[in-house]
């Protein structure tokens, strides 16, 4: 019996799985998939501080193994008073489904499950699997998808191609496919001076002057012009702080934070060299700290991305745009294990108050996924 993706979405949204808390969402999916013949492995990883509940479910044992990747955790709701409806009620009003996770990305998970439920698995020469993380949105993501991938390797399980259900669409479902993502690196720059009284500047050294010059140079540096698949890299100054509340004190230290979203023209090392050289040209009294969120990657268009584009065209009439724009996703981990592509709902209300998606869009996404599965396994229509 085929699953209704909208009803399943309502049920999954009802679990308040604010990252990294699960609150039963993974068990619900495991129980649902078990009824359709999936072998389900509920996988919990973590430390003394947090335990993240994940799921790997597989139907069949052959190859190729087509895997759908997603996450059940959601961002916090924000001010509940500003929501039209309870964010975990899965309420539908005027054909619109409201709820935290409706877009990012519980409904996409349900659309894929519904698509699989419509398939005659006797015609599948291979396997279909789902890899569902319990922490993609939060700070404990290493216990989500990366830990599942390690478990797969340790247990000699292999996925051959992965479809990630992140909300990639812009104006209409299926208008944008992600074949890669930009990298993201954070910089913390500290300039040191000598604290003192503003009336005696000759006895102090104001580090703000050096920082202003550094940030001005960074802001006027063109990192690159982009290429065929990536937009130009860009740097954003996200904060400047001296921790000084007194008007008559020259601060001794100033700190700035930057984030660079970068394409495959650069590496984290090349960007560090650019920032470091700018600092060194200005002052010797500085420190740089970095944290890498993910390197850029691309899976160049292939027969499977062509299949997904064809599935979109057949079911919606839409000609999909191939893109690498947007933020990071768990695809940055999966790309080291197999080719990966991303397609999901429209992203215009993701993480917002009154996050919502239309019922029609959920059904449309399920239809696209179903057609893609059929083309992937060459299933007769």
Curated annotation (Swiss-Prot):
What Pfam families does the annotation carry? Answer: M20_dimer (PF07687), Peptidase_M20 (PF01546)
Q: Detail which positions bind Zn(2+) 2.
A: 104, 137, 351
What pathway or pathways are given for this protein in its record? Amino-acid biosynthesis; L-lysine biosynthesis via DAP pathway; LL-2,6-diaminopimelate from (S)-tetrahydrodipicolinate (succinylase route): step 3/3
What are the UniProt keywords, alphabetically? Amino-acid biosynthesis, Cobalt, Diaminopimelate biosynthesis, Hydrolase, Lysine biosynthesis, Metal-binding, Zinc
Location of the active site? 73, 136 (proton acceptor)
| EC number assigned by the record | 3.5.1.18
What's any GO biological process attached to this entry?
Answer: lysine biosynthetic process via diaminopimelate
Similarity remark: Belongs to the peptidase M20A family. DapE subfamily.
HAMAP family membership: DapE (MF_01690)
Q: What does this protein do?
A: Catalyzes the hydrolysis of N-succinyl-L,L-diaminopimelic acid (SDAP), forming succinate and LL-2,6-diaminopimelate (DAP), an intermediate involved in the bacterial biosynthesis of lysine and meso-diaminopimelic acid, an essential component of bacterial cell walls.
Q: How does it assemble?
A: Homodimer.
Q: Which PANTHER family match?
A: ACETYLORNITHINE DEACETYLASE, N-ACETYL-L-CITRULLINE DEACETYLASE
Q: What is this protein called?
A: Succinyl-diaminopimelate desuccinylase
Question: What organism is recorded for this protein?
Answer: Ehrlichia chaffeensis (strain ATCC CRL-10679 / Arkansas)
Q: Which gene encodes it?
A: dapE
């Amino acid at each position: 019996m085929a699953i209704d993706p909208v009803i399943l979405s309502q049920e999954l949204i009802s679990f308040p799985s604010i990252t990294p808390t699960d609150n039963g969402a993974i068990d619900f999916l495991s129980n649902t998939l078990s009824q359709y013949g999936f072998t389900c492995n509920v996988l919990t990883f973590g430390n003394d501080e947090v335990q993240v509940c994940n799921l790997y479910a597989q139907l069949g044992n052959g190859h190729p193994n087509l895997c759908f990747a997603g996450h059940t955790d959601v961002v916090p709701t924000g001010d509940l008073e500003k929501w039209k409806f309870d964010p975990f009620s899965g309420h539908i009003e005027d054909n619109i489904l409201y709820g935290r996770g409706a877009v990012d990305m519980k409904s996409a998970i349900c659309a894929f499950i519904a698509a699989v439920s419509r398939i005659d698995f006797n015609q599948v020469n291979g396997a279909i699997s789902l890899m569902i993380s319990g922490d993609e949105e939060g700070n404990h993501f290493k216990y989500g998808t990366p830990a599942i991938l390690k478990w797969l390797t340790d247990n000699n399980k292999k996925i051959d191609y992965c479809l990630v259900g992140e909300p990639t669409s812009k104006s209409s479902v299926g208008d944008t496919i992600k074949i890669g993502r930009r990298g993201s690196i954070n910089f913390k720059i500290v300039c040191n001076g000598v604290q003192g009284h503003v009336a005696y500047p000759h006895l102090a050294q104001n580090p703000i002057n050096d920082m202003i010059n550094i940030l001005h140079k960074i802001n006027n540096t063109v990192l690159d012009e982009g290429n065929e698949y990536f937009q130009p890299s860009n740097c954003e100054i996200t904060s400047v702080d001296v921790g000084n509340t007194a008007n008559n004190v020259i601060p001794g230290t100033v700190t700035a934070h930057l984030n660079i979203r970068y394409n495959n023209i650069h590496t984290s090392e090349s960007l560090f060299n650019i920032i470091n050289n700018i600092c060194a040209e200005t002052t010797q009294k500085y420190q740089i700290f970095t944290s890498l969120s993910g390197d850029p990657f691309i899976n160049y268009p292939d027969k499977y991305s062509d299949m997904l584009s064809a599935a979109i065209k057949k079911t919606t009439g839409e000609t999909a745009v191939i893109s690498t724009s947007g933020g990071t996703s768990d695809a940055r981990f999966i790309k080291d294990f197999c080719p990966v592509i991303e397609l999901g709902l429209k992203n215009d209300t993701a993480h917002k108050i009154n996050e919502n998606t239309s019922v029609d869009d959920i059904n449309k996404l399920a239809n696209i996924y179903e057609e893609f599965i059929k083309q992937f396994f060459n299933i007769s229509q």
